[in-house]
Amino acid sequence: MSSGGLLLLLGLLTLWEVLTPVSSKDRPKFCELPADIGPCEDFTGAFHYSPREHECIEFIYGGCKGNANNFNTLEECESACAA
Protein backbone atom coordinates (compact mmCIF):
# COMPACT_ATOMS: atom_id res chain seq x y z
CA MET A 1 0.00 0.00 0.00
CA SER A 2 1.32 3.44 -0.87
CA SER A 3 2.05 5.98 1.82
CA GLY A 4 -0.85 8.13 0.55
CA GLY A 5 -3.26 5.20 0.82
CA LEU A 6 -2.00 4.36 4.29
CA LEU A 7 -2.42 7.97 5.37
CA LEU A 8 -5.98 8.02 4.00
CA LEU A 9 -6.81 4.80 5.84
CA LEU A 10 -5.39 6.18 9.08
CA GLY A 11 -7.43 9.37 8.66
CA LEU A 12 -10.65 7.42 8.03
CA LEU A 13 -10.06 5.20 11.07
CA THR A 14 -9.44 8.25 13.24
CA LEU A 15 -12.63 9.91 11.99
CA TRP A 16 -14.62 6.73 12.65
CA GLU A 17 -13.27 6.55 16.22
CA VAL A 18 -14.27 10.15 16.94
CA LEU A 19 -17.77 9.84 15.46
CA THR A 20 -18.68 6.43 16.89
CA PRO A 21 -20.77 6.69 20.09
CA VAL A 22 -19.88 4.80 23.24
CA SER A 23 -20.68 1.15 22.71
CA SER A 24 -22.92 -0.67 25.16
CA LYS A 25 -19.96 -2.72 26.42
CA ASP A 26 -18.25 0.52 27.59
CA ARG A 27 -21.42 1.99 29.12
CA PRO A 28 -22.11 1.39 32.84
CA LYS A 29 -24.66 -1.39 33.42
CA PHE A 30 -27.07 0.96 35.23
CA CYS A 31 -27.53 2.89 31.97
CA GLU A 32 -29.36 -0.17 30.59
CA LEU A 33 -32.00 -0.09 33.37
CA PRO A 34 -35.49 1.08 32.38
CA ALA A 35 -36.83 4.43 33.57
CA ASP A 36 -38.31 3.93 37.04
CA ILE A 37 -40.72 6.54 38.39
CA GLY A 38 -40.44 5.16 41.95
CA PRO A 39 -43.25 4.88 44.52
CA CYS A 40 -43.42 8.50 45.71
CA GLU A 41 -45.62 11.25 44.29
CA ASP A 42 -43.34 14.31 44.40
CA PHE A 43 -43.33 14.41 40.61
CA THR A 44 -40.44 16.21 38.94
CA GLY A 45 -38.62 16.10 35.63
CA ALA A 46 -35.58 13.84 35.41
CA PHE A 47 -33.55 12.14 32.67
CA HIS A 48 -32.70 8.52 31.94
CA TYR A 49 -30.63 6.88 29.23
CA SER A 50 -32.69 4.90 26.71
CA PRO A 51 -30.65 2.08 25.13
CA ARG A 52 -33.30 1.72 22.44
CA GLU A 53 -33.13 5.40 21.44
CA HIS A 54 -29.37 5.68 22.14
CA GLU A 55 -29.90 8.98 23.94
CA CYS A 56 -30.96 10.54 27.22
CA ILE A 57 -34.68 11.20 27.51
CA GLU A 58 -36.71 13.24 29.98
CA PHE A 59 -39.25 11.42 32.14
CA ILE A 60 -41.36 12.14 35.22
CA TYR A 61 -39.74 10.93 38.45
CA GLY A 62 -41.73 10.45 41.65
CA GLY A 63 -38.93 11.76 43.89
CA CYS A 64 -37.75 8.62 45.72
CA LYS A 65 -36.24 5.19 45.13
CA GLY A 66 -36.33 4.32 41.42
CA ASN A 67 -32.95 3.13 40.12
CA ALA A 68 -29.50 4.43 39.17
CA ASN A 69 -30.55 5.35 35.61
CA ASN A 70 -31.95 8.64 36.91
CA PHE A 71 -30.30 12.05 36.49
CA ASN A 72 -31.23 15.60 37.47
CA THR A 73 -29.95 17.12 34.22
CA LEU A 74 -29.48 16.11 30.61
CA GLU A 75 -25.77 16.89 30.96
CA GLU A 76 -25.36 14.46 33.89
CA CYS A 77 -27.11 11.72 31.93
CA GLU A 78 -25.04 12.28 28.80
CA SER A 79 -21.81 12.39 30.79
CA ALA A 80 -22.55 9.07 32.48
CA CYS A 81 -24.21 7.12 29.70
CA ALA A 82 -24.21 8.71 26.26
CA ALA A 83 -20.72 10.19 26.05
Swiss-Prot record:
The keyword Repeat does not apply. Gene3D superfamilies: Pancreatic trypsin inhibitor Kunitz domain. InterPro entries: Kunitz_BPTI, Kunitz_BPTI_sf, Prtase_inh_Kunz-CS, TFPI/VKTCI-like. It is found in: Secreted. Disulfide bonds join C31-C81, C40-C64, C56-C77. Residues 31-81 form the BPTI/Kunitz inhibitor domain. Expressed by the venom gland. Keywords: Disulfide bond, Protease inhibitor, Secreted, Serine protease inhibitor, Signal. The keyword Signal applies. Residues 1-24 form the signal peptide. Its main location: secreted. GO terms for cellular component: extracellular region. One of its GO terms (molecular function) is serine-type endopeptidase inhibitor activity. Pfam families: Kunitz_BPTI. Serine protease inhibitor. Belongs to the venom Kunitz-type family. This is Kunitz-type serine protease inhibitor scutellin-3.
